[in-house]
Amino acid sequence: MATYKVKVATGTDFFSGTLDSISLTIVGTQGESHKQRLNHFGRDFATGAVDDYTVQCQQDLGELIIIRLHKEPHSFLPKDPWYCNYVQICAPNCRVYHFPAYQWMDGYETLSLREATGKTTADDTLPILLEHRQEEIRAKKDFYHWRVFVPGLPNYVDIPSYHPPPRRCRNPNRPEWNGYIPGFPILINIKATRFLNLNLRFSFVKTASFFYRLGPMALAFKLRGLVDRKRSWKRLKDIKNIFPATKTVVSEYVAEHWTEDSFFGYQYLNGINPGHIRRCMQIPDKFPVTDEMVAPFLGEGTCLQAELEKGNIYLADYRILDGIPTVELNGQKQHHCAPICLLHFGPDGNMMPIAIQLSQTPGPDCPIFLPNDSEWDWLLAKTWVRYAEFYSHEAVAHLLESHLIGEAFCLALLRNLPMCHPLYKLLIPHTRYNVQINSIGRALLLNKGGLSARAMSLGLEGFAQVMVRGLSELTYKSLCIPNDFVERGVQDLPGYYFRDDSLAVWYAMERYVTEIITYYYPNDAAVEGDPELQCWVQEIFKECLLERESSGFPTCLRTVPELIEYVTMVMYTCSARHAAVNTGQLEYTSWMPNFPSSMRNPPMQSKGLTTLQTFMDTLPDVKTTCIVLLVLWTLCREPDDRRPLGHFPDIHFVEEAPRRSMEAFRQNLNQISHNIRQRNKCLNLPYYYLDPVLIENSISI
């Protein structure tokens, strides 16, 4: 008779426990136990509980390799979902086996779990283990399907549970709820989130903090009448009163300094879209700036050509926005442009705008605006650039390059790598809640009647078109941060704190990934010979990059260094890249003139005509402003249930070497955090968006 001591850990989130009957079968190399119900006097499997049980077997089962958890009805009680963290079994020889689960069992089902040691296909020799990993992948591919979101954009997750059950209503003539929440100014497609699978949903705590924060704020806007006013703002200072209780050092700085050229240029380096600017070695033909135009702003003893040769001239080109039609908002036609902005990095360390053209096509009706133009001409020209920044940031840098790309990485991981695979264990913490927040994003932003349709000058179709163009230009090198800085020519630009911090985090990730990868992949042949890894990479190329070869994304990985770079890129994209463009959104956008989502007058075609009144009449109206800020406030306010970068409470790795690597990674991140905070003490405007304690492991908000 062999005795096995079993520990079963239930999740800590509300309603993780179950009243259903749970049984266990243990499979070893020398036999299999009978199915035994796990039950003792009192409540079993309560939320947060770690329950102890004893399983008796007729013989020693040898090395334990698989367990099966059977969830069945208990008496007359209704079905009750259960979240299992893990199962630990102490064998008669005192060896402890760990079986990670970290998933919901919703219905009456059997869940097979492997022992936690990370293994590639080449490491498995037992037929039962090979069959188990194949069956796991087959089951996940049957459940998780790709779905076209918008042609030309990364595909996303289409799950059978997305579709609501047949409508049951006593009155068949009763109209179906249209999706509006009373008092909320935009349509929310609740169906896109309501039927999401439990394993992809927010925790109860996160859901409650997210939605219960949204409702009261929307109601407050309604009671104050802000979402019903379709007129211009009367005074700029009134915009400060939208969020009177959410002021920060940065948001106050933005409101006070937004008109200054130095702050305008600073945002290209350390704002919320710091990856757009690039060094200019030659003025493009479509932007006919002359030395006579900009000489007064370059300093004495130099000229435009000299500054170009020194590498002090930078360009922000918004050609991706060219030619996209606009829509009407609140009964008024909106306007649009694709500006070009030339900047100069001076000896005083300031990045200063020196010329702005509000079109991609030069001509007599498209003047080049300069800092010595009238105050309101120059300010409105800069505001048009900030308007273009809104779309460059929200559509490309934020939604496309972090959320949608990250979701594709996540789905490809779930479909192609079994739980025992080392890369699954390494990357699964960086996929947490990604699908849920993207479902909310589509429900809030990218549906008919949503934010893009009701508060953006480009509307839903135009906003999607910007993302499609963004994906058509996206490259693998641009997602690998060190390569991106070199390609844009900003690798040695002083005062670029985003670059300094992102490289520090990237290299810390790279060291961590290197230690994990080299532990499981001793040579290049192990990488090239891993079919599950290769299928994961191929599916990302197919479903995320849509098989576009010009993207430079690999279709296979052949060497250990290639795998290290690829995995680091995925990890960085799903964590730090998102933090850099998301965390500061409200601080930089709460002062609406710094980040307008729409413009109500056309771009200026001549100089000297802009006044304060025309400036105010060009900015978004009160309703549009408040709709945008309400949604951004909701999406930027981090709810509870955070997991900072490097915090891995779920035990996926059990080997000593990976555990040491995880601890070393945390120590490196702590040092980076300390360095950032020490630097910020000396700055008038701190940059902390890539402080590891503020970076989430995953895209979860």
Swiss-Prot record:
What's the catalysed reaction? (5Z,8Z,11Z,14Z)-eicosatetraenoate + O2 = (12R)-hydroperoxy-(5Z,8Z,10E,14Z)-eicosatetraenoate; N-[omega-(9Z,12Z)-octadecadienoyloxy]acyl-beta-D-glucosyl-(1<->1)-octadecasphing-4E-enine + O2 = N-[omega-(9R)-hydroperoxy-(10E,12Z)-octadecadienoyloxy]acyl-beta-D-glucosyl-(1<->1)-octadecasphing-4E-enine; a N-[omega-(9Z,12Z)-octadecadienoyloxy]-acylsphin-4E-enine + O2 = a N-[omega-(9R)-hydroperoxy-(10E,12Z)-octadecadienoyloxy]-acylsphin-4E-enine; (6Z,9Z,12Z)-octadecatrienoate + O2 = 10-hydroperoxy-(6Z,8E,12Z)-octadecatrienoate
Which Gene3D superfamilies does the UniProt record give? 3.10.450.60, Lipoxygenase-1, Domain 5, PLAT/LH2 domain
Q: What class of enzyme is it?
A: oxidoreductase
The cofactor binding remark recorded in the entry reads: Binds 1 Fe cation per subunit.
- List GO molecular-function terms, semicolon-separated: arachidonate 12(R)-lipoxygenase activity; arachidonate 12(S)-lipoxygenase activity; arachidonate 8(R)-lipoxygenase activity; iron ion binding; linoleate 9S-lipoxygenase activity; oxidoreductase activity, acting on single donors with incorporation of molecular oxygen, incorporation of two atoms of oxygen
- As given in the record, the signal peptide range reads none
Location comes to:
Cytoplasm; Cytoplasm, Perinuclear region
Q: What EC number(s) has UniProt assigned to this enzyme?
A: 1.13.11.-
Check the record and name the InterPro entries matching this protein.
Answer: LipOase (IPR000907), LipOase_C (IPR013819), LipOase_C_sf (IPR036226), LipOase_CS (IPR020834), LipOase_Fe_BS (IPR020833), LipOase_mml (IPR001885), PLAT/LH2_dom (IPR001024), PLAT/LH2_dom_sf (IPR036392)
Boundaries of every PLAT domain copy:
2-119
Q: Which GO terms describe its biological process?
A: arachidonate metabolic process; ceramide biosynthetic process; establishment of skin barrier; hepoxilin biosynthetic process; linoleic acid metabolic process; lipid oxidation; lipoxygenase pathway; positive regulation of gene expression
Got any disulfides in this one, which pairs? none
Q: In which pathway does it act?
A: Lipid metabolism; hydroperoxy eicosatetraenoic acid biosynthesis; Lipid metabolism; sphingolipid metabolism
The entry's Fe cation-binding residues are: 398, 403, 578, 582, 701
The record describes the protein's role as: Catalyzes the regio and stereo-specific incorporation of a single molecule of dioxygen into free and esterified polyunsaturated fatty acids generating lipid hydroperoxides that can be further reduced to the corresponding hydroxy species. In the skin, acts upstream of ALOXE3 on the lineolate moiety of esterified omega-hydroxyacyl-sphingosine (EOS) ceramides to produce an epoxy-ketone derivative, a crucial step in the conjugation of omega-hydroxyceramide to membrane proteins.
Protein name listed in UniProt: Arachidonate 12-lipoxygenase, 12R-type
The organism is Rattus norvegicus (Rat)
Kindly list the organism's lineage: Eukaryota, Metazoa, Chordata, Craniata, Vertebrata
List the gene name. Answer: Alox12b
